[in-house]
Amino acid sequence: MRVYDAKVNHMTNPMGFFMDGVSFSWKVDEARGKAQKAARVRVAADEKMQEILFDSGMDEQADSLAYPVELALEPRTRYFWQVTVLSDAGEEADSEVQWFETSKMSEEWTGKWLTCDNTEKRHPIFSKEIAPAKEVAKARLYVTGLGLYEAYIDGKKVGDEYLTPYSNNYNRWVQYQTYDITDQIAGGGKLSILLGNGWYKGRFGFSAFEDKGYYGNEWKVIADVVLTYTDGTEEVIGTDESWTVTRSRIMFSNLYDGEQIDATAPELPAEEPTVCDAPKGRLEARRSLPVVAHEHIKPVELIHTPAGEQVFDMGQNFAGIFTFRVKEPAGTKIHIQTGEVLQKGDFYNENLRSAKSEYIYISDGNETVIRPHFTYYGY
């Protein structure tokens, strides 16, 4: 008998999610028996399951679809758990040890909400050098940015999610995400948070809101880096006036209209960030599941249309982004549009109405792999 697909609140090893309760679930196969007779759930403070915090004992009422357990959870804490299942044929099997890690919960933030000069259209990057004082046992980044954000350490993206912190009513609540950055920051490094417009800032909804943000018109960011050292002490580095603001080469981003990058744009002098008011919505641990790349699809055909266009046929309809390698002379403009059908053999996207659904890249002459950061396309 095998116990598998063990989840917490229907998620596998969730980190930093909002939890107003804890529920466990699991599946069983390869069993002689026809049904589960009982199950035992144990929760521990260690992966070896020796420091037991909760033990249900063999419970004949345990529901494998959702078994709620009352736990006094602590903020920023990883818990380990395991389920043992007894079948009606007398078989017994354990799941693999799983874990879940709590968010900041009600803990106060060290970081302050920061903004910058919002009249400059080039998308901002908020940065801070992180220099651990001792040997790092673990490191966590708690962060959100409005409208959208991507975090980097020494130029390498943190996590594999896109379009964070996702779409919700920002006037009511703003989600923050939690990342394990232990390996990336253990030796120190530069933490950078790139902001885009998204649903919060920029065109969203009906035409009355095209010239201003639906929820707000300021870029905003808040973050706490929590370094836990091997001696058990902690250091918290939050967003404050000591951070710096530089400008990316993203000139424009919008969920409807796409993104524009000018790699030839000159570097601008660093700016000082400004401490700003928090957004209207309460800052709360994430509820949205990660948006990640589930599949990489290659074009099945390059079509040369009667109008002289070059159209890549992806072979199916989907929502996503694209990546491509470019090496063109400096100043070369690459213009990509997306659509779902051809009309009379030519590219057609007038069904998108006013949405431009495009990507514009101006090359600086260097070979690079590029992708959109703060938009996605249906094509």
At which residue positions do the language-model features occur?
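Extracellular/oxidizing-compartment recognition motifs
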Residues: 1-78, 82-379
